[in-house]
């Protein structure tokens, strides 16, 4: 009973120690906390944070100054700070903000609110409150003559202004003037705003702000803008000094960019969007196209796999030095963005283009999932929705001349209000898993909501797209058309949007689904049936074999077409077939003229005329080789005509078409380390085609194929979603691995077994993947691993996240986040972020910060002057971002930041007559944020040079509560505790430290042993529960790192002690399930101190790898001992393991000691060691002996009881006989047999004697006999009288009936 009691006691002790850091403290609420601070100055700000028991936190900021915003329940200002070198320029910036909000109680259920802009309007006091923001910013910069070599260090922090966590309309008018001429020696400062809904850590959004309150109204100072030429933010991914432009914006010209770079570990994806801006450096783009004097350059560039490429675009002959990935740009009036993706193993590229006309220089750029009010001319708006199971993509843009607000038949989340000449409207609705509807309306004349419709008006084209989602198949229809009214013409590809001149607008609907088929139909009709009748304008008949080839040159690139096996049903059809072997040099296209005429095709037929004049000159060769095989395309139709470049064919009558596809397809690229080859199976389908281009470039995959050409559509229904778009149209591919390609500035959509959704064109990106995901943003490298969907968060946009771990969120009406450089020279700053975000309509986030060594804080002064000071922390800092008003569960994201700062000082001048403090504590999170007011402080200005690298790791397990800093024993304590370890010391230690949950043995895995060094000895690990938790949590990650994290079932079974005679401490040995095929490779990596096992890891995993003792074998402790113990059958071979008192310590059975030279002994329960195995065998024998002994004792006890019973009976009989001997010694001397015979004889003799005596004598004898008993013995006729004292006389009976005394005979 002592051992179970000791186990129970140790369990209670360990539980008590772990209770200090129990994960339940982060899950359940701890009551209500309130923090309120008020200044006694003229302007007051109060902050209240309430956390209820249902894991919901509400933050309330009430601010008023001079009675302007008196006691309004809304966030007034959320500002961030960044330090810029004061020697570069002198800047002064002012901004004024007024907010008001209008909503009703019923609106909260359906997320429908009415918003409008106003100026200095107070909120209503009725039940229907009113809220609307208005921003006005002006900045003046004066460049100095000093040109510092360091970059401008600006923190990227979103500015959120929200009320009740509901999005609202934001109107921004930004004007920037430069007082100094721009020369090559003048330093350039750029203005960037948060316009993407992708990443809150994007360095493309530097915003430097300070909060100031005057006597009349509140003002919001924004001080991070300068110059007409944007400064390219530094992104040093390989410890070099090269600068890659990720995102920049120049608001002096009518354009704005959005950049999102996403890199996946298993299937990396990069998505970028860029717009036009002016530069002063002299360089040529990789590829450009000049349209009618202006420049509209689609630039395509590829880099090696695994590298992060940047994107930029220019609009004048003097190009930027930045090497752009993919961009399209039109000078003077259009802004376009192009997205390209580069993957390491499976390729995926997605591109889209947006362009719109600019009438006045004042242009506002609105991010996704928000609405925009344009006061002058035009804007583009993109709305994207992400779903848990069916993530669609929807993007539209364009502009029309319209005065009235665009109306929509459906209730969408985004709307546009027009004040001036033109604007564009994009409508998108959040969907369930059953339906998707998208409508784009460009003018007051609206199209009906049907499957597909288009309407050409005086101001442009309005199109409506509706997509019904079926259970097994789906067809979507979309149309893109435009009218040209000015010499400036932009080429509009399919599945991308563009606006030419000032009177047209297209629509784009692109969706990617995990398991639901998606088909793209033409503008004329959609049919959800499994086959579609083909209507075309060309006739003819041809049957080609695989040997026939045809070559042609298209647009400056060489292409080779090879015919595949073709079978046609009609006697006379025309065949469009090709197998292209194209090698592109990415040459600079000097000029390009594209004219398109479309009478808006109908079901009967269509005619399209396309001409292309492209002259190419050699430039830097980018050698991209595509080997594609296309199907033979045979069509027939009613009597119609189709005119293409150089040919015309007409036919009469109606006929059908059949397509037989059976040919291989392969894709290769020099920039990819691998080559993908796809073998095509035979497939037959009938489709609807309207062909209007000179050639078709398609690719055949494992499934049925449909094609779409310019201003036409191809629809096909099959069991697997596959859609191909060529000739300035979209291309998509579905295969077992996500692979897709982009041609001629067109979009690419992908459908794979893994639900992945990518949305570009100023829209948010949502991803759901079962594979590790790595996100990379500008000026930072972000790596993410998640089993769930983890999007990023940006300003004024929605973020959606689904996680297996519910993490409570914090609702805040104001959020401030800032991380600046350290104030200490030559200091490495290391920070760790933990991010948890969720909520489709959340507009603000709360910030908490915790420092491990040096406290980091954000100091804000809320007083009459409302100045802000920030200080930075060095070493290790932890930030926790929690999304506002999140109702769903969210997964924690951990971000590790390491910032080397050679020299850094902060420049801040604060004049604060009165101070106040604001403190916020976010419940259910492991960090906190504090805003502390300080008095007037003057710091010396100096330059700041810093670069950060972010690593984002998402995990849905329960290891988030484990400390990230490795816990080890101090060297002094280890030396003190490492005295001689004996049997008496190990008796108090547990035999093993098992995993928290049951660990099954995976298939193909083997149990190995990983030993640790003295700093993690067994006694220390037992005494420090968090240290053992770190071994269970981070050792599998350390073992999986050199294998690129491809194994998912590496788990630690238990931690056991191992005693080595050559060591003075107990070695902690972790028993780990590891893939059998990689054990030898792991052993080689562990024995090599410079291998990837010790160098590739990051954070705690790398520290854990450094603690592994390479002298401990991986397999010897388990398998050799099993064989040795199994071979020893006699008791002598294993007796040494059982004898605890022998003290010899012989290890004759241990195969480890004989092979490695170290005599390992088991101090606990390393049950797979040699000693333990012999103990097991001996223990089994001992158990048998104990069982036999117990049975013998029980049987012996039973026999003893029976013996005692018989002995007791015998003793009782003996005592009775003894008493009889004492009473009758004469009788007792005679044997019972003799006594019986003699008695019978005497009785007979007496009877004979009595017969001869008289009657009176007989009476006397009878009386003697009756009184004294039968006393006549030994032939005595006289009675022998017994002792009267011991005898009992008998009562006489009647002698005779005649006389009771018998005297009649006497």
Curated annotation (Swiss-Prot):
Which GO cellular component terms, listed alphabetically, does the Swiss-Prot or TrEMBL entry include? Answer: cell surface; extracellular region; plasma membrane; site of polarized growth
Q: Does the keyword Lyase apply?
A: no
Please report the name of this protein according to its UniProt entry. Answer: Signaling mucin MSB2
Per the record, the gene is MSB2
Which residues are exposed on the Extracellular face of the membrane?
Answer: 22-1185
Q: What does UniProt give as the signal peptide span?
A: 1-21
The free-text function statement in the UniProt record for this protein reads:
Plasma membrane signaling mucin that promotes activation of the MAPK for the filamentous growth pathway. Partially redundant with the SHO1 osmosensing branch for the activation of STE11.
The protein's matches in PANTHER family, at most eight in alphabetical order, are given as: SIGNALING MUCIN HKR1-RELATED
Compositionally biased, Polar residues: which spans?
Answer: 519-528
Q: Which organism is it from?
A: Saccharomyces cerevisiae (strain ATCC 204508 / S288c) (Baker's yeast)
């Amino acid at each position: 009973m002592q051992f179970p009691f000791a186990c129970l006691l140790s369990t209670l002790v360990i539980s008590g120690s772990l209770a200090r850091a129990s994960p339940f403290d982060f899950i359940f609420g701890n009551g209500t906390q309130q923090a309120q601070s008020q200044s006694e100055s003229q302007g007051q700000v109060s902050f209240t944070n309430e956390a209820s028991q249902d894991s919901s936190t509400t933050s309330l900021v009430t601010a008023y100054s001079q009675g302007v915003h008196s006691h309004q329940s809304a966030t007034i200002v959320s500002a961030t700070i960044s330090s810029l070198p004061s020697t570069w320029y002198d800047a002064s910036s002012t901004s004024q903000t007024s907010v008001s909000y209008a909503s009703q109680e019923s609106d909260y259920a359906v997320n429908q609110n009415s918003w409008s802009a106003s100026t200095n309007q107070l909120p209503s006091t009725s039940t229907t409150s009113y809220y609307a923001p208005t921003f006005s910013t002006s900045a003046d910069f004066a460049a100095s003559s000093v040109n510092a070599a360091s970059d401008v260090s600006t923190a990227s922090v979103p500015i959120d202004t929200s009320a009740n966590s509901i999005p609202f309309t934001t109107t921004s008018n930004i004007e920037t003037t430069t007082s100094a001429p721009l020369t090559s020696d003048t330093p350039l400062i750029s203005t960037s705003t948060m316009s993407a809904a992708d990443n809150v850590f994007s360095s493309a959004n530097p915003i430097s702000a300070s909060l100031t309150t005057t006597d009349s109204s509140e003002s919001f100072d924004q001080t991070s803008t300068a110059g007409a030429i944007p400064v390219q933010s530094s992104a040093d991914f390989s410890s070099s000094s090269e600068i890659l432009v990720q995102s920049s914006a120049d608001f002096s010209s009518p354009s704005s960019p959005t950049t999102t770079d996403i890199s996946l570990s298993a299937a990396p994806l990069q998505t970028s969007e860029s717009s036009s801006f002016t530069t002063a450096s002299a360089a040529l783009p990789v590829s450009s196209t000049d349209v009618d004097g202006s420049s509209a350059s689609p630039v395509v560039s590829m880099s090696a796999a695994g590298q992060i490429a940047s994107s930029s675009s220019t609009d004048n002959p003097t190009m930027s030095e930045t090497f752009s990935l993919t961009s399209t740009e039109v000078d003077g009036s259009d802004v376009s963005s192009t997205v390209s993706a580069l993957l390491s193993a499976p390729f995926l590229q997605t591109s889209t283009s947006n362009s719109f006309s600019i009438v006045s220089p004042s242009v506002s750029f609105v991010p996704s999932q928000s609405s925009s009010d344009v006061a002058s001319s035009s804007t583009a708006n993109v709305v994207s929705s992400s779903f848990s199971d069916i993530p669609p993509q929807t993007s539209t843009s364009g502009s029309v001349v319209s005065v009235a607000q665009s109306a929509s038949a459906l209730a969408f989340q985004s709307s546009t209000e027009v004040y001036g000449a033109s604007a564009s409207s994009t409508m998108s609705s959040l969907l369930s898993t059953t339906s998707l509807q998208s409508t784009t309306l460009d003018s007051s004349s609206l199209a009906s909501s049907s499957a597909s419709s288009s309407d050409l008006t005086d101001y442009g084209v309005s199109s409506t797209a509706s997509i019904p989602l079926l259970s097994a198949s789906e067809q979507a229809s979309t149309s893109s058309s435009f009218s040209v009214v000015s010499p400036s013409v932009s080429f509009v590809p399919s599945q991308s949007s563009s606006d030419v001149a000032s009177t047209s607008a297209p629509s784009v609907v692109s969706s990617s689904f995990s398991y639901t088929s998606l088909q793209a139909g033409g503008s004329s009709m959609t049919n959800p049936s499994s086959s579609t009748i083909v209507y075309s304008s060309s006739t003819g008949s041809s049957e080609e074999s695989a040997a026939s080839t045809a070559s042609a040159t298209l647009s400056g690139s060489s292409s080779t077409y090879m015919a595949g096996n073709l079978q046609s049903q009609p006697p006379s059809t025309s065949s469009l077939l090709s197998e292209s072997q194209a090698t592109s040099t990415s040459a600079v296209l000097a000029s390009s003229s594209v004219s398109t005429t479309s009478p808006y095709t109908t079901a009967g037929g269509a005619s399209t005329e396309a001409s292309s004049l492209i002259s190419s000159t050699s430039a830097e060769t980018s050698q991209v080789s595509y080997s594609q095989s296309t199907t033979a395309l045979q069509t027939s139709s009613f009597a119609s005509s189709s005119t293409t470049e150089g040919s015309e064919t007409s036919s009469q009558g109606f006929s059908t078409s059949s397509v037989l596809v059976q040919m291989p397809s392969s894709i290769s690229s020099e920039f990819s380390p691998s080559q993908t080859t796809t073998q095509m199976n035979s497939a037959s389908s009938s489709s609807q085609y309207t062909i209007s281009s000179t050639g078709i470039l398609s690719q055949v995959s494992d499934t049925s194929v449909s094609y779409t050409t310019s201003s036409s559509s191809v629809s096909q229904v099959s069991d697997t979603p596959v859609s191909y778009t060529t000739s300035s149209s979209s291309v998509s591919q579905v295969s077992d691995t996500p692979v897709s390609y982009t041609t001629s500035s067109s979009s690419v959509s992908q459908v794979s077994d893994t639900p992945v959704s990518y949305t570009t064109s100023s829209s948010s990106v949502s991803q759901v993947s079962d594979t590790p995901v790595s996100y990379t943003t500008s000026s930072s490298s972000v790596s993410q691993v998640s089993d769930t969907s983890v999007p990023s968060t940006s300003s004024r946009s929605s973020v959606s996240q689904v996680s297996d771990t519910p993490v409570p969120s914090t609702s805040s009406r104001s959020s401030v986040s800032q991380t600046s450089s350290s104030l200490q020279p030559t200091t490495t700053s290391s920070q760790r972020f933990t991010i948890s975000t969720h909520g489709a309509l959340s507009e603000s986030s709360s910030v908490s910060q915790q420092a491990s060594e040096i406290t980091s804080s954000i100091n804000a002064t809320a007083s009459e002057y409302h100045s802000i000071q920030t200080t930075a922390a060095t070493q290790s800092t932890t930030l926790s971002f929690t999304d506002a008003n999140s109702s769903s569960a969210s997964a924690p994201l951990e971000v590790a930041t390491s910032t080397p700062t050679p020299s850094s000082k902060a420049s801040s001048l604060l004049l604060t007559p009165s101070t106040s403090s604001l403190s916020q504590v976010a419940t259910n999170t492991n960090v906190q944020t504090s805003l502390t007011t300080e008095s007037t402080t003057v710091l010396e200005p100096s330059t700041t040079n810093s670069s950060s690298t972010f690593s984002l790791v998402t995990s849905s397990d329960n290891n988030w509560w484990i400390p990230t800093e490795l816990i080890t024993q101090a060297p002094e304590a280890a030396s003190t505790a490492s005295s001689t370890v004996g049997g008496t010391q190990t008796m108090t230690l547990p035999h093993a430290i098992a995993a928290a949950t049951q660990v099954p043995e995976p298939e193909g895995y083997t149990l190995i042993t990983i030993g640790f060094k003295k700093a993690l000895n067994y006694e220390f690990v037992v005494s420090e529960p968090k240290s053992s938790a770190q071994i269970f949590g981070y050792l599998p990650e350390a073992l999986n790192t050199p294998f690129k994290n491809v194994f998912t079932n590496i788990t630690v079974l238990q931690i056991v002690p191992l005693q080595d005679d050559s060591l003075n401490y107990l070695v902690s040995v972790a028993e780990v399930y590891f893939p059998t095929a990689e054990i030898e490779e792991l052993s080689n990596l562990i024995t090599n101190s410079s291998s990837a096992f010790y160098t590739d890891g990051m954070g705690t995993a790398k520290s854990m790898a450094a603690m592994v003792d390479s002298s401990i074998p991986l397999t010897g402790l388990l398998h050799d001992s099993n064989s040795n113990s199994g071979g020893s059958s006699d008791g002598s071979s294993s007796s040494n393991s059982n004898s605890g008192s022998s003290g010899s310590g012989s290890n004759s059975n241990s195969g480890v000691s004989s092979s490695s030279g170290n005599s390992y002994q088991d101090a606990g329960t390393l049950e797979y060691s040699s000693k333990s195995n012999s103990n097991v065998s001996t223990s089994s024998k001992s158990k048998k002996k104990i069982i036999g002994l117990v049975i013998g004792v029980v049987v012996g006890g039973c026999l003893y009881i029976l013996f005692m019973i018989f002995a007791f009976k015998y003793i009782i009989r003996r005592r009775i006989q003894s008493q009889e001997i004492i009473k009758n010694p004469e009788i007792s001397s005679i044997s019972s047999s003799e006594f019986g015979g003699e008695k019978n004889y005497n009785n007979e003799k007496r009877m004979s004697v009595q017969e001869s005596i008289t009657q009176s004598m007989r009476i006397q004898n009878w009386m003697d006999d009756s009184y004294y008993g039968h006393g006549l013995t030994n032939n005595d006729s006289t009675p022998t009288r017994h002792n009267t004292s011991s005898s009992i006389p008998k009562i006489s009976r009647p002698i005779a009936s005649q006389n009771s005394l018998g005297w009649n005979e006497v």
